[in-house]
Amino acid sequence: MPTLNWIGKDKVANHHHDVPFRVLDHKYGYSAEKGEQSEVTKSGNKIIHGDNLEALKALLPEYEGKIDCIYIDPPYNTGKEKWVYNDNVNDKKIEKWLGEVVGAEGEDFTRHDKWLCMMFPRLNLLYKLLKEDGLFFCSIDDYEQGNLKPMLDIIFGHQNFLNNIIWQRAYSPINTKKRFSANHDFVMCYAKNKSQVNLLLPRTEDANDRYSNPDNDYRGIWKSSDFSVGPVVAEKLYPITLPSGRIVTPPSGRCWLLTKERYQEFIDDNRIWYGENGDAVPSVKKFITEVKDGMTPMTVWTYSEVGHTQDAKREIKELFPKSKLPFETPKPTKLLEKILSLKNNPNAIVLDSYAGTGSTAHAVLNLNKRDGGNRKFILVELEDYAEDITANRVKKAIRGYEFDGNKKTVLKSYSINLTNLKKSQKIIEELDLYKLNEKYSNVTLESDNGNIAIIGEEYISGKTEGTGGSFDFYELGAPIFNPDQNLNEEVGEQKIREYIYYTETKQHLEREQIAEQKYLLDNYNNTGYYFYYEKEKFTTLSVDTLNIVTEKAEQYLIYADHCLLEKEYMMARNIIFKKIPRDIKRF
């Protein structure tokens, strides 16, 4: 297979291993009920301010292999974003890039190399965080799409590529463009393990409306499907006598779906439909109870379905009417909702390491409100607006926000197809029913790109309805280890205890430290975990100091600076010694 090479590839291939592990410093919690609070909400929702490379590393102890869905919207590298390469890679060529704004095409001849060097270690960490049946989505355009695909093939494996979604982000051309006016972006989709993924979107009312029950079948509503197929199979070529007496044969170049014997079985089971007058070419009844729980997604998503860039800007303007926001291409919440719906799990953990305006969190909250789910979000944002914009938007989504003006809502949407054209009268009747709803000052029909929608417009003056929910805000703290690989005591002993306990058990340390059991972390799975550590002196595990063990267990794992116990002695008593700091696991 072709390989992707770039300046610095060999230097960044394992750079994610060199990134220091930092603790997360909790700054505050926020909930719909209490507002801002000093206590941790324990909601599982997190917003982290800091470099996403270090933040992703900090998430590994708790979330490695546990994230259900990842969505990222990295810099497109158009030359306009003014992003800066800041990864401290030990290489002379790369060190020259540090702190430099990446320039435009034709001005900066290493711009694509810088982008690939920036993305590669982050994608490696994202891959480690993703669950075995997890989904990965990345927004991109043509500037780097051609480089992103082979890079993701390296990390995920080309066999785990699912598809490239085309999102229609603009609804009108930019006439000042010299050649083409691009009106789409891509959303690249990969699985951690394709064999464990089943992509389905929730069934829509429009899809379900295609089912009916004209013959009152006890099995419920159904729709008819074609009884002829191709290519021709000889045993499936035979004449059929309809209930009306008319004789029909398959269309030219096709045959019937079933053999004559199986056709009779379907008749006996009342699964063949000849139309209301018994004179239609036979079709097979497909019951809604027998179809998949969701719908197979298509790869072209129009702005009428999921919104466009101007919709996204309007959303942000509603939330921050007096602010000039540093975003040219935010993503509409509807787009994120559809992406997240592909991971058909109401309890999914969702990660966005390029959080921007916080659209991903807003989409998670909307979905939870809509279906009663308990999805969690983790957002990471490097820039200083992580608090003022990203977190502030999530606060407003949770509690509602002041708004004065008209708000449009898609009440119902239909595909323009033969089935819906036949029931156009029913659509008009539904439109009239919505017009009776006093909530909406105006209800109209709007058509666009093969869809027709009933739009309700309401005037809101005051506070919008919030989604409810809560989150915790964190800053990236100090690294657990100093450059010399000794423990960094600045982070505090409790953070070190939590880190060690998690590396050993994959569990959170809930047990509080008390004076009588100073060195005990906790007991888990019949093993007692001890961190025999003193800030001012070395600790030695010996017969004289075994009194640090304060609770009986089947096995004991003890961290200390030194050990004087013989191996045979420890084996006889099921004691495992680990040296500080050498044996503390690094992520």
Please tell me what each predicted stretch does:
Residues M119, E132-D133, D142-L200, E387:
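Signature of N6-adenine DNA methyltransferases within the class I
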Residues R370-F587:
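PRPP-dependent phosphoribosyltransferase catalytic core
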Residues M1-V12, N270-Y274, L546-N547, Y556-H562, ...:
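Coupling/switch/interface segments within P-loop NTPase motor domains and analogous charged loops
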Residues L4-W6, A13-H15, K92-K93, L116, ...:
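Conserved S-adenosyl-L-methionine
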Residues E64-L135, Y143, Q159, H184-F186, ...:
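SAM-dependent methyltransferase catalytic-core segment centered on the flexible catalytic loop
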Residues Q37-P61, Q310-I349, N366:
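Glycine-rich adenosyl-nucleotide cofactor-binding module
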Residues A191-K322, P332-T333:
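Active-site-adjacent helix-turn-beta-strand microarchitecture at beta-sheet edges
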